[in-house]
Amino acid sequence: MKINSKKMKYLSKITNSIYEDLKIEFLYHSNHLEGSTFSKDELEKLLTEKKVEGSHSLDDIIETKNSLEVFDQVINDSGEKLDKFMLFNWHKLLKKGTVDDEIHNIGMWKKYENKLRGVDLKLALPVEVDNLMFNLLSNYNELETVTLKDIADFHYKFEKIHPFQDGNGRIGRFIILKQCLEWNIDLIAIDDKYDDEYRNALYKAQKTGDSEDLVTVFKKCQNRLDEKLEKYKNLLEQVDVDMQN
């Protein structure tokens, strides 16, 4: 489902509608990939009623609440140039009040070497991060047009750099959201139905530089999201009319 930045900002002002459903759908899957225990119903309760249901760690509660705020910030930032200061702000919003806020410099590149559990992948050293991210962002911002493959390539390179001490997966998927909005590409929410395929395709791309499988997973996730949001087709058509008037 294609929704550009302007339309998404318009939709954000319509209560009890597609914006909230999309927000829940995107965040549920993205957070679940990182071990969040919130169900969709519990996430919706937190969003709409500011109530926490279920048994969750304090950090999970705080970071889930923060992710709702980051989503809105990403929408607000769509259309603006992607740079490290924007990423710093997203990371600070995501991690404020968590354990990481107490022991790490949130909203900054990592200070200590980090690693991924269960995979043989060497991540960038802290001293390398600023230069690598400068090159990644510069090359992306110089593109005259952005394709799904460009988004996949950016994603695997970002995750291989792993520029923050923690929270890289979530920030990386927020970047995907921003990119899709800005280039009128069908939105991507990494559905947990394709969790293993996503992880395997991401790892393959990071090891070989071949993002073909990752593009395939993105397409599956696009189709899955389309199916879930089909009920809003008429609303989106009406919004198009309203925005032209």
Which residues are covered by each model-predicted region?
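FIC/Doc superfamily catalytic core
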Residues: 1-245
